[in-house]
Amino acid sequence: MRCVPVFVILLLLIASTPSVDATQKTKDDMSLASFHDNAKRFLQTLRNTRSCCPEEITCCPWG
């Protein structure tokens, strides 16, 4: 009998939590996956330029 009030309170708390993000996304919002993809791409480019740029300047993407 003591568990019934606790169970009811838990049900009420679960029902009151929003299941979807209530805030509207703006064009400035960027997903975290996109941020990680950009970071990976940047690190890959940096790694590639480090291996080729000391020998040959023309292989660098910026010059």
From Swiss-Prot:
It is found in: Secreted. This is Conotoxin Pu5.4. GO terms for molecular function: toxin activity. The cysteine framework is V (CC-CC). The keyword Signal applies. The modification Tryptophan amide is found at residue 62. It comes from Conus pulicarius. GO terms for cellular component: extracellular region. Expressed by the venom duct. Contains 2 disulfide bonds that can be either 'C1-C3, C2-C4' or 'C1-C4, C2-C3', since these disulfide connectivities have been observed for conotoxins with cysteine framework V (for examples, see AC P0DQQ7 and AC P81755). Belongs to the conotoxin T superfamily. It comes from the Eukaryota. InterPro entries: T-conotoxin. Residues 23-50 form a propeptide. Disulfide bonds: none annotated. Residues 1-22 form the signal peptide. Keywords: Amidation, Disulfide bond, Secreted, Signal, Toxin.
